Swiss-Prot record:
Keyword set, alphabetical order: Cell inner membrane, Cell membrane, Hydrolase, Membrane, Metal-binding, Metalloprotease, Protease, Transmembrane, Transmembrane helix, Zinc
A Pfam family: Peptidase_M48
Subcellular location per the Swiss-Prot or TrEMBL entry: Cell inner membrane
InterPro entries, per the entry: HtpX_protease (IPR050083), Pept_M48_protease_HtpX (IPR022919), Peptidase_M48 (IPR001915)
Matching Gene3D superfamilies: Metalloproteases ('zincins'), catalytic domain
Name the record gives this protein: Protease HtpX
Co-factor note (free text): Binds 1 zinc ion per subunit.
Gene name, Swiss-Prot/TrEMBL: htpX
GO molecular function: metalloendopeptidase activity; zinc ion binding
Cellular-component GO terms for this entry: plasma membrane
Organism: Shewanella baltica (strain OS155 / ATCC BAA-1091)
Main location: membrane
GO biological process assignments: proteolysis
Length: 287
């Protein structure tokens, strides 16, 4: 639930800034073309800025320690495994990092296939067998090779644009309706209009989050398939089985969680960035 809240809050922050800037610049929201252009600038702008700084943000947020020179055999094996899988997948070697967390998790991030980061938690590194870890690493390398970071950024940009545009169009319709039934023809007034826009931003933002989560789940299945090709189906299934036996992951922020191996669980599957582990295992066994 915390992941969902953070995702919605981030989108709402972008939308709120867009509203303030539009008001300051006097953008006429009744002009559909101008509104759509402005919505696209903010919708895609925020998404691509997040993508551009994603690797830097991940290192700072998670306290990732990039392995430049392996200190022991475990770190050496980790780097060599990622290097081998990256070569198999046809991508540039990602940076490899470790972050301190008891959770068994890992994630991939970065603005492109040739500028990426694969990070694993200490809980995963020392709590799984090498075969299981190899499956996890293959999953993350597949995310990079599939271009999932860019794909979901584009999807996020589209839905952000939709939210900004649709909320203000609907608010304009409501304002016109109130104005036509008001003797003075003043409409909602600035503060009431902003309140209506905020509520609509929130409602459309929830819908947008569901759409992004749907596409994220599809990308998870694709990353599992890619991992099965890189490391073998048995290793990927073993990794998922191990994760299923463990506690829910709790320590990863939303932006990294979307590309992690183990997502947050939710009563409503449509709000989850990852399919249930049982479904992922079943899909691999059926493939």
């Amino acid at each position: 639930m915390k992941r969902i809240f953070l995702l919605i809050a981030t989108n709402l922050a972008v939308l709120l800034v867009a509203s303030i800037v539009m008001s300051i610049l006097g953008v006429n929201t009744s002009t559909m073309g101008g509104l759509l252009v402005f919505a696209a600038i903010f919708g895609f702008g925020g998404a691509f800025i997040s993508l551009a700084i994603s690797k830097w943000m991940a290192k700072k947020t998670m306290g990732c320690e990039v392995i430049t020179t392996p200190r022991d055999s475990t770190e050496r094996w980790l780097v060599e495994t990622v290097a081998r899988q990256a070569k198999q997948a046809g991508i540039k070697m990602p940076e490899v990092a470790i972050y301190q967390s008891p959770d068994m998790n890992a994630f991939a991030t970065g603005p492109s296939k040739d500028n990426s980061l694969v990070a694993v938690s200490t809980g995963l590194l020392y709590g799984m067998s090498q075969d299981e870890i190899e499956g996890v690493l293959a999953h993350e390398v597949s995310h990079v090779a599939n271009g999932d970071m860019v794909t979901l950024t584009l999807i996020q940009g589209v839905v952000n644009t939709f939210v900004i545009f649709a909320a203000r169009v609907v608010a304009g319709i409501i304002n016109n309706f109130v104005s036509s039934n008001d003797e003075e023809g003043e409409g909602l007034g600035m503060f009431a209009y902003m309140a209506v826009v905020f509520v609509l931003d929130m409602l459309f933002g929830i819908l947008a989050s569901i759409i992004v989560a749907y596409f994220s789940r599809i990308r998870e299945y694709k990353a599992d398939e890619g991992a099965a090709r890189l490391a073998g189906k048995g290793k990927m299934i073993a990794a998922l089985e191990r994760l299923r036996q463990g506690p829910e992951s709790t320590a990863m922020p939303a932006q990294m969680s979307a590309f992690g191996i183990n997502g947050k669980r939710s009563m409503a599957e449509m709000m989850m960035s990852h399919p249930p582990l049982e479904k992922r295992i079943a899909a691999l066994r059926a493939s």
